[in-house]
């Protein structure tokens, strides 16, 4: 074995398997491009993006880590979102949640 060497099994790796998803239509009503990263809490994206924010609460883009989606001015497109996992706590971003997503 070489230090740092990985032994990978044959087959496909399915991202976000068995996680809740939602598909939303998103429009950029602004005058500048808006780019959203893979792990940004979609509910808290730029207000110029128009979509059903309630359905996006606790969700992020269902894309590979480290990638992003760009919305040009006037552009509309459908995106697939996936539920955040782990503790389901959100801090930062635009400060609209600042705590647990699932209130007990």
Curated annotation (Swiss-Prot):
The record's GO molecular-function terms, alphabetically, read:
urease activity
The record lists the catalysed reaction(s) as:
urea + 2 H2O + H(+) = hydrogencarbonate + 2 NH4(+)
**How would you classify this enzyme at the top EC level?**
hydrolase
Pathway where this protein functions: Nitrogen metabolism; urea degradation; CO(2) and NH(3) from urea (urease route): step 1/1
* Enzyme Commission number: 3.5.1.5
Tell me the Gene Ontology biological-process terms attached to this UniProt entry: urea catabolic process
Localization in the cell: Cytoplasm
What keyword terms does UniProt attach to this protein?
Answer: Cytoplasm, Hydrolase
A GO cellular component entry from the record: urease complex
**Domain of life of the native organism:** Bacteria
Q: Fill in the subunit field for this protein.
A: Heterotrimer of UreA (gamma), UreB (beta) and UreC (alpha) subunits. Three heterotrimers associate to form the active enzyme.
**PANTHER family linked:** UREASE
Known NCBIfam families for this protein?
Answer: PRK13203.1 (NF009682), urease_beta (TIGR00192)
Q: Which family does it belong to?
A: Belongs to the urease beta subunit family.
The record, for HAMAP family, names:
Urease_beta
Name of the protein in its database record: Urease subunit beta
Organism this protein belongs to:
Rhodopseudomonas palustris (strain BisB18)
